[in-house]
Amino acid sequence: MRKALLFVVLCMFITGCDWFREKPEIATVLAKHFDNKLYNKFDTAIYLPIFKAKLEDQSKGFLNPKLISAFYAKNEYLPKLITKFYVTGQLDTLKSFVAQSKADGFNPEIFNATAYEKQLQALNRNQFKTIDEVYEAIADLELNTAYILNKYTNFMGYGSINPRNFFNRFYIKVLRPDSLKMDSVLNTENLVAELKKVQPTNRPYIELKKALANYRDSIGNEETPQVNAIKMNLERMRWRLPLQTEELVVVNIPDFTLTWFKQDDTLAHMNVCVGGKREATYVQKMKRYLKTGRLDDKPKNHETPQLFSVFNAIQVNPIWNIPVSIAKSEIYWMARKDPYYLSN
């Protein structure tokens, strides 16, 4: 009985010793990098509740909170991004890309630029007095890295908005990042490669970036019509079309022009007719029209739809007849009201 009791006590003593606790990878990486034994005290049992509480609190501001939460749940809530990318300097590269996003028309603060720089500096200084300070710093830096990486690659690679949710008559099925794509970015083994992959490289985009820099230097004011117009067009160029082709016919609706491109060459350029902006009170008038059914209440909407399609054939100088829908809903009704409408 005494031997059995001694064996149980001995087992409990051995299990409770730090000597036999498995050291987390983050402890090994940071202790070696900074030559500081403090990081060897890193205890995941203490760190995990701190990280989970911060994740729950900060995820409300994430672009894709469910995706990031699932990523950490799969990785046992460990600081995977810091472990993989801090020592190699790739987190500093991420900070640099975020700072340079101003050249693409973004405000770097939408990516928490200032806070991220301070968090990196705190770890770089390596002046923690207790391991508890390390837990707080690692948790904040890890979560901000995930937030920035997810948001930056989405915004730079696909645009900051989905135009189909923004424009009234936008029928282009622009490519958008799905959960598999975003998860692959968080699980990457080469963070810098992911950042480079989402940079727009087409010539018009590069030329617009140069124009933005020139206007900023010459005007010295960020909030001008010229600067804002360039920013909006940079955003439009980040929207990914469903198909990339060597030849492209582009209708510039505000400019009333059509241009036929073949790669960087212009094959044709001409003026075209486009629709006008719909009435300012369109929504209210449409509600009234749906109730009354009277054509007098129907609001005018002649906006040119934004669409993308592939030409199978082109007919030059076609015979154009008034579409039946226009004849019924507009011309017939106006002719009944005004006997001289057609002659005028």
What are these regions (language model features)?
Residues 18-170:
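Cationic-aromatic interfacial patches
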Residues 179, 184, 207:
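Conserved catalytic/binding loops enriched for acidic/polar residues
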Residues 9, 130-137, 174-181, 190-191:
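Alpha-helix capping and helix-coil boundary motifs
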Residues 13-16:
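C-terminal motif of bacterial Sec signal peptides marking the signal peptidase cleavage site
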Residues 2-8:
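Sec-dependent signal peptide recognition
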Residues 18-65, 143, 150-151, 155, ...:
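Well-ordered beta-sheet/strand-loop patches within structured domains
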